[in-house]
Structure formats: structure tokens, C-alpha cells
């Protein structure tokens, strides 16, 4: 499992996100 804090963060690319979160299609990290 990826380590991804449950914080809503807007993003344009994966590097905008914390830890191992990825930028999802709806424009938020997850």
C-alpha cells in the first residue's frame, strides 16, 4: 500500500502531492 495522508490537496502532477500520493484525474491527490 502507498503511504498517503488523507488530506485534500489540489494538484496538477504527482510531485504536487505529499508522500506517495498520486495526482488523480479529478485534480486532487489520493
From Swiss-Prot:
What is the originating organism of this protein?
Cyclanthera pedata (Achocha)
Which residues carry the site feature described as Reactive bond? 6-7
Similarity comment? Belongs to the protease inhibitor I7 (squash-type serine protease inhibitor) family.
Report the protein's function.
Strongly inhibits trypsin, weakly inhibits chymotrypsin.
Q: Which GO terms describe its molecular function?
A: serine-type endopeptidase inhibitor activity
The UniProt entry's GO CC annotations, sorted and at most eight, read: extracellular region
UniProt entry keywords in alphabetical sequence: Disulfide bond, Knottin, Protease inhibitor, Secreted, Serine protease inhibitor
Q: Report the SS bond pairs.
A: 4-21, 11-23, 17-29
- The residues that cross the membrane are none
Q: What is this protein called?
A: Trypsin inhibitor 7
Q: Tell what the record comments on domains.
A: The presence of a 'disulfide through disulfide knot' structurally defines this protein as a knottin.
Amino acid at each position: 500500500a502507498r503511504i498517503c495522508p488523507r488530506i485534500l490537496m489540489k494538484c496538477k502532477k504527482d510531485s504536487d502531492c505529499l508522500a506517495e500520493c498520486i495526482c488523480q484525474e479529478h485534480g486532487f491527490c489520493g
